[in-house]
Amino acid sequence: MLLKDKTVVIFGGSGAIGRAAALAMAKESARIFLAARQADKLEKAAAEIRAAGGSVETLQLDVLDGGQTTAQVANLAGRTGGIDIVVNATGFLHNQGKTLAQLSLAEYHQGFVPFLDAQFTIAQAVAPWIGGEREGVIITTIPPSATMAVPGHLGHIVGCAAMEAFIKALARELGAKNIRVLGVRSHAIADAVLAGSYTAEVFATKAQALGLSVEQWLGGAAHSTMLQRLPTLAQIAGVITFLASPSAAAMTATVVNVTAGATLS
């Protein structure tokens, strides 16, 4: 019961990582609130958690709409008496594969603008309602590219690096309020594509350019890691749950490397 009676808000809660994290945290007796844009996907995710015996409610919102996000979070916090844990598992379609000569400015921006806007909007919306006497935790999931130099990933690399920098800067700003800020850096997740992740479309573009199927591309990605395998949704969810727990109470301003050795911290 690592998270007994904790109020957890998961943005991107209908996605593959968000659902996995919700299931793992619900098993530790957390009270789960899933936030995402599409009502049908939200309800499907919530039904999965209820079927496993978890406590869950949903919030339909767009994290790129700051006013909407702030209002819904404030309403939730008013009902629950505050928020303990926030997970940002949002993701946005972007290009991976086009080089400088092929990339438009709009495609370049798509690699980082929505990711950073979501990170800011979520942090600004939740910060007034966490911390103080009840410790607060903000955890963001991040792709691995911040420390990579891979052709065809200009916007994506910039976005990942900026997300990691934001985590460290925000941790310094919110630490005095008893709020920890952390990141989970994952490689491509082995079973996320089958779980309906938007990354299936992102990976398909890269795979097609190489004359590969998505499955073949994932196999190559696995062999490129030190462990010769990719992380799984359950493993990522387990790390998120640990970071949110009292066992990680001394951790902040940290990005945890869960890339199976694809990157070095």
Which ranges hold each PLM region?
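Conserved glycine-rich cofactor-binding loop
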Residues: 7, 14-15
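Short C-terminal tail/terminal secondary-structure segment
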Residues: 97, 229, 240-242, 252-265
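Short, small/polar-rich loop/turn modules that mediate ligand/substrate recognition or access, typified
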Residues: 175, 180, 251-253
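Catalytic loop of short-chain dehydrogenase/reductase
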Residues: 92, 105, 111, 137-163, ...
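Alpha-helical segment proximal to the catalytic Tyr-Lys
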Residues: 128, 172-173, 249
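Substrate-binding pocket helix/loop in short-chain dehydrogenase/reductase
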Residues: 97-100, 104-112, 203, 221
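A glycine/serine/threonine-rich, flexible loop-to-helix segment
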Residues: 176, 189-224
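The beta1-alpha1 cofactor-binding region of Rossmann-like NAD(H)/NADP(H)-dependent oxidoreductases
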Residues: 40, 60-71, 105
